[in-house]
Structures are given as structure tokens and as C-alpha cells.
Amino acid sequence: FGRGGRGVYILTDIPDLDAMLSSKPSHVLSQKYFRDLLYAQDIFEDLIVMEELHPPYHSSYTLVQKEEVCTLDHIREWGSASQTFRGVVNYDKDIENFTKILAREYNLEYTFNIELATNSQGKLVLFDLNPRIGASSGIDKDLGVNYPYLSLKLLLGENIELIYKNILNRRFVRYLDYVWSD
């Protein structure tokens, strides 16, 4: 997970260069290689170093209306980073309560997206907070929650009313269609 635009790498003990170059996925680096790289630099950009996280990976989208939030959670089953091919959409009260706290603490008054994954103790850990909804939120329109449209309504100062807390274990599959061209 997390390669490409997110710039996330897993540091591990890899015995030599051949083992590193032949290892997959390619977002795994040896600790020695990374340490030597850092020591060789005079100036480098800020880094965030955190524990290794594991599936399930969650991407939750939130609309904020005054003191209330509307959050749906997407759990990735197949895919990587923002390219989730198959997943499950749920209303999760605990995650929604967490997003309510985030909205209050970080003064998030419109829309946002959080990414969560599981640490080695089995607890969900926040590893990304985006002050916007992601493009993937558009798939929820078929479940009655059209995030892009509702975001525009909020922007215009209109109230929104949603029935979404009954959305449980709704599986989606996407990007698997054929397009023919001459």
C-alpha cells in the first residue's frame, strides 16, 4: 500500500542489494540503505516515520454540517492506495464519532477524508487526513449519498438531510468494464 503519490515506504532488514532489488513490492527499502541515504544528505525534506500498518485499510469520507457529520467508511478488499477495485462500504458509528472529534479539534467545517489502517496491536491508526473528499466518494451516490452534489449544497449554505446509517456491508467492484475503440 501507499506507494506512488503518498511516498510511503516500509523499512525492513534486507541482507543485500540483490535481495532488495528482487523484493516485491518495490516500496520496501532496507533500513541500512535508508540510514546511509539520510546520513549522506546535508538537507532533506521533512519525513514522517511511523509504525508499519496492516489491512484492513479504511478510507472514510465526511461531510460536516454545523456540529453534525455524515461519514461512510470504505474498506479496501482489493487494490492499492487510491485504486481500490473491490471494497465494502459501511456506516460505522465509532468511525463517525472519531470524525466528529477530528472536525471539532482541527476546525474542519466542510468535507474531509481520513485514511486508517491497523497496527500490530489490532487498533485502527489514522495515517492520513485530507481536507477534501476523494474522487472515490463518488461511488456512494448509488447508495443514496452523493458526496460531490451534497458538498455543493453545503457550499451554497443549504441544509442536507441524509438517510445513511442503514448502509452496512455494501460491496462494490469498479474499473472492470470493457471499452472498445477502432
Regions found by a protein language model. Give the residues of each.
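A short catalytic or substrate-binding loop motif that flags glycine-/basic-rich loops and adjacent residues
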Residues: F1-G2, E52-P56, N107-Y110
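Conserved anion/nucleotide-ligand pocket segment
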Residues: F1-L11
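A short, flexible beta-alpha/helix-coil linker loop
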Residues: G2-G4, W78-S82, R132-A135
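Short, solvent-exposed loop/turn segments at secondary-structure boundaries
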Residues: Y9-L11, R86-G87, G138-K141
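A short beta-strand motif that forms part of the nucleic acid-binding face
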Residues: T12, I75-E77, N130-P131
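Short, charged/polar, Gly/Pro-enriched secondary-structure boundary elements
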Residues: L17-D18, G134
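Phosphate-binding site of ATP-dependent enzymes
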Residues: L21-N97, A117-V125
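ATP-dependent carboxylate activation and anion-phosphoryl transfer catalytic cores
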Residues: Y91-D182
